[in-house]
């Protein structure tokens, strides 16, 4: 008799995706982040579902309903902080996952990569709308500033912004629709994750050498299931440390003040995981230019496979490209720091230089360095 996991139509899909899946024998812990992202998504959907049972998306009661969740609902405080800090863990894993793809040349799997970029946009949109829901000062002003950027689009901009707002300012209609979309998008993301995996399993995983590993594959279970469980334990431990010891470390104190359209906070800034893009936006003194740079800072990932000029797929054996990769990482950390600083003398210039460097490394220096390394191979 055939094993049920190999014969049952549903079990067969699970078996071929997580149990008998052939995986390269040499993939490192950098390949853990895919499974961690799946767990983050599941955690966010679960905690979000329970929060939605007690939340009210009305401007008069939204802030108080979040307070009520934290004070009166059984274990409501842990749900709220797991959800808020879970988003931070989600983005840490996302950025490391994308960084791994860049370093090891995983972007050569075009379909998987492109769906991944769309997923990144979808997760960023979901996180932005979620930040508006507690209806604190930073929620309100963040929503006002970011949605208002669309008014920079020529001809249709103003109409588009008012259409998104559902009125002439961020108000009840905006909050209600943001809640609706914030609830809906994670399920669309979950469906897109399935497509992401479908395309990945068509080609199989990449590995640190960048060389096809068809000759040396091992089953996913038990080798990588146990590896993923270790990563999961480390992530859960980090998340619980955050939630139980310093739940507000990554948040903004201004969001504990109820939204007030009549008083602007001294420094309007998004959550930490958007600060690098926010710094790029602010570094251009033109509204439309800033918006374009903001979108392109993420959209540039789409063209990375076209900029690959090296004869080798991975950066494992390309020391010059490695130097550029870590320079790019340092540059992104610099942009993240600048995004949280006020718009004044030294920070403006640092932000502009870091923004120019960001695009230059990706579009100019990396392809040229790869060509140079190709030439060095002939020596």
Curated annotation (Swiss-Prot):
Co-factor requirement: heme b
Any one GO BP annotation for this protein: mitochondrial electron transport, ubiquinol to cytochrome c
GO cellular component, one term: mitochondrial inner membrane
Cofactor binding summary note: Binds 2 heme b groups non-covalently.
Note: Heme 1 (or BL or b562) is low-potential and absorbs at about 562 nm, and heme 2 (or BH or b566) is high-potential and absorbs at about 566 nm.
Assembly, per entry: The cytochrome bc1 complex contains 11 subunits: 3 respiratory subunits (MT-CYB, CYC1 and UQCRFS1), 2 core proteins (UQCRC1 and UQCRC2) and 6 low-molecular weight proteins (UQCRH/QCR6, UQCRB/QCR7, UQCRQ/QCR8, UQCR10/QCR9, UQCR11/QCR10 and a cleavage product of UQCRFS1). This cytochrome bc1 complex then forms a dimer.
Function of the protein: Component of the ubiquinol-cytochrome c reductase complex (complex III or cytochrome b-c1 complex) that is part of the mitochondrial respiratory chain. The b-c1 complex mediates electron transfer from ubiquinol to cytochrome c. Contributes to the generation of a proton gradient across the mitochondrial membrane that is then used for ATP synthesis.
The protein, known as: Cytochrome b
Species: Myotis pruinosus (Black whiskered bat)
């Amino acid at each position: 008799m055939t094993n049920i996991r190999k014969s049952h139509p549903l079990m067969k899909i699970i078996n071929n995706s997580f149990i008998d899946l052939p995986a390269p024998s040499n993939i490192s812990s950098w390949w853990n982040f895919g499974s961690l992202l799946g767990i983050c998504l599941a955690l966010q959907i679960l905690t979000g579902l329970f929060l939605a049972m007690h939340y009210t998306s009305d401007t008069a009661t939204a802030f108080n309903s979040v307070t009520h969740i934290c004070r009166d609902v059984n274990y409501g405080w842990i749900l709220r902080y797991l959800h808020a800090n879970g988003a931070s863990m989600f983005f840490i894993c996302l950025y490391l996952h994308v960084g791994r793809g860049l370093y090891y040349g995983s972007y050569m799997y075009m379909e998987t990569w492109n769906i991944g970029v769309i997923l990144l946009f979808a997760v960023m949109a979901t996180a932005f709308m979620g930040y508006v829901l507690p209806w604190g000062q930073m929620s309100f002003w963040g929503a006002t500033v970011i949605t208002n950027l669309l008014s920079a689009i020529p001809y249709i901009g103003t109409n588009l912004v008012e259409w998104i707002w559902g009125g002439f300012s961020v108000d009840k209609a905006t909050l209600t629709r943001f809640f609706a979309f914030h609830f809906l998008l994670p399920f669309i993301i979950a469906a897109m994750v399935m497509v992401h995996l479908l395309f990945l399993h068509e080609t199989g995983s990449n590995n640190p050498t960048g060389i096809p590993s068809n000759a040396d594959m091992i089953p996913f279970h038990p080798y990588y299931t146990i590896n993923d469980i270790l990563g999961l334990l480390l992530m859960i431990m980090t998340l619980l440390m955050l939630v139980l010891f310093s739940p507000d470390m990554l948040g903004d104190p201004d969001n504990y003040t109820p939204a007030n359209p009549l008083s602007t906070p001294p420094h309007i800034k998004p959550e930490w995981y958007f600060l690098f893009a926010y710094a790029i936006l602010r570094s251009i003194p033109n509204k439309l230019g800033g918006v374009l740079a903001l979108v392109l800072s993420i959209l540039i990932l789409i063209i990375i496979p076209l900029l690959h000029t090296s004869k080798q797929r991975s950066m494992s054996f390309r020391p010059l490209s490695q130097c550029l990769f870590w320079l790019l990482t340092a540059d992104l950390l610099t942009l993240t720091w600048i995004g949280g600083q006020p718009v004044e003398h030294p920070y403006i210039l640092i932000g502009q230089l870091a923004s120019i460097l960001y695009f230059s490394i990706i579009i100019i220096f990396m392809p040229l360095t790869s060509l140079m390394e190709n030439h060095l191979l002939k020596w």
